[in-house]
Amino acid sequence: MLDQPIGVIDSGVGGLTVAKEIMRQLPKEKIIYVGDTKRCPYGPRKEEEVLQYTWEMAHYLLRHHHIKMLVIACNTATAIALDEIKATLDIPVIGVIQPGARTAIKVTNNQQIGVIGTANTIKSEAYKEALLSLKAGLAVQSLACPLLVPFVESGTFLDQTADEVVKDSLEPMKETGIDTLILGCTHYPILKESIQRFMGSDVSIISSGDETAREASTILSYKGLLNTSQEAPVHTFYTTGQQQNFENIARDWFGYLPGKVETVSLEHVYQQ
């Protein structure tokens, strides 16, 4: 059980930002990653579709890779599917919304927090509810940014157009008075430098990867599931879309290719 992998799932490449942090904090753990790039983005999809797709990824990892923990490294999937999956599976399941909310509350000075995310994440008000459940009286400004996920998935964030897309998307958030901005989508940290430039140095930018990895570490330790092997872990990354594009983005984000990349088909893997 100890040497079984951690499963990380996302609608595409965004969850790589979380996987990278888990690999940094838990260097002995093996990661099996599934990015549903073929059906990305999840943000504008119907809730029942997001639930179905998230279950397909989870079921694939359980059946074929016998994971010991599932990390839903997608804010949209966390908002829609976390509670059901967590209540159903007998392994630890964590999402990215609560960790991000906790971090933002630690950082803010003026108690004004902004949240950017996909249409579904913002519509769910999952971040607002998480923030206010942890600390009453916060002022929470939310903004859907539907252009950012397709932009990251296309790989064109590697050129100068990133600043323009960020400006067009975040303009309404600029003058709200927030001092802390939650990147409520795991794709967004890939654009963090552009977002920081646009929002200014006086706004703290929060991504949930660090806190999510810390939560994974705490839970695995508490349950006695940390890998004690001295062998270097071998990570595997699966994409439902274009393998080469996934590899290019992964290589850019990590600075190297952190494991083998393969394609996988998830349709009809799981039927509710």
Curated annotation (Swiss-Prot):
Substrate binds at residues 10-11, 42-43, 75-76, 186-187. InterPro entries: Asp/Glu/hydantoin_racemase (IPR015942), Asp/Glu_race (IPR001920), Asp/Glu_racemase_AS_1 (IPR018187), Asp/Glu_racemase_AS_2 (IPR033134), Glu_race (IPR004391). Disulfide bonds: none annotated. It comes from the Bacteria. Its EC number is 5.1.1.3. Pathway: Cell wall biogenesis; peptidoglycan biosynthesis. Gene3D superfamilies: 3.40.50.1860. GO terms for biological process: cell wall organization; peptidoglycan biosynthetic process; regulation of cell shape. The active site is at residues 74, 185. It holds the Pfam family Asp_Glu_race. GO terms for molecular function: glutamate racemase activity. Keywords: Cell shape, Cell wall biogenesis/degradation, Isomerase, Peptidoglycan synthesis. PROSITE patterns: ASP_GLU_RACEMASE_1, ASP_GLU_RACEMASE_2. It catalyses: L-glutamate = D-glutamate. Provides the (R)-glutamate required for cell wall biosynthesis. Belongs to the aspartate/glutamate racemases family. PANTHER family: GLUTAMATE RACEMASE (PTHR21198:SF2). This is Glutamate racemase. It comes from Bacillus pumilus (strain SAFR-032). The gene is murI.
